[in-house]
Amino acid sequence: VTELAKYAKEKGIGLIPAINSPGHMDAMLVAMEKLGIANPQANFDKVSKTTMDLENQEAVGFTKALIGKYMDYFADKSKIFNYGTDEYANDATNAQGWYYLKWYGLYNKFADYSNSLAAMAKERGLQPMAFNDGFYYEDKDDAEFDKDVLISYWSKGWWGYNLASPQYLASKGYKFLNTNGDWYYI
């Protein structure tokens, strides 16, 4: 990665490193269990294979420490750090993870988690970036999110997956990087 970062700098190419959480954490969840962290997965209709339980403080602490190490590494190699936040527990909820977070009163925990990662990026001089999914789900102000986060807008949602519209997020002052998943393979 150091060699790639050096090459990119020589060519004037910006890198955007990404560590996706609290979803898409398959390998990290397996590693947590092997390291003795009990039940790091979200559990709704079934246990998620991809998403961390935001109420498991040991899992959250481990994840923040790991992401912090990557942020430290990239602080002098990149201007932006994408910390993910998309598709929360879709594998455990029939693609309704955000709905479940709201139903169980956990949506503010997600916002707090997202905001803490944004703060970590800013402390290191990095522009925080996150995918749009969980920000103001259903165009509602059920929680507050850091306004400095650059939104990587990848999906407008699909049936029953009611993501905030670009217009709604723009009205709140967010800036975007268009990463629309309909136009390329992610």
Model-assigned labels for residue ranges:
Residues 88-91, 96-186:
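Catalytic-core regions of glycoside hydrolase
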Residues 1-130:
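Substrate-binding cleft of carbohydrate-active enzyme catalytic domains
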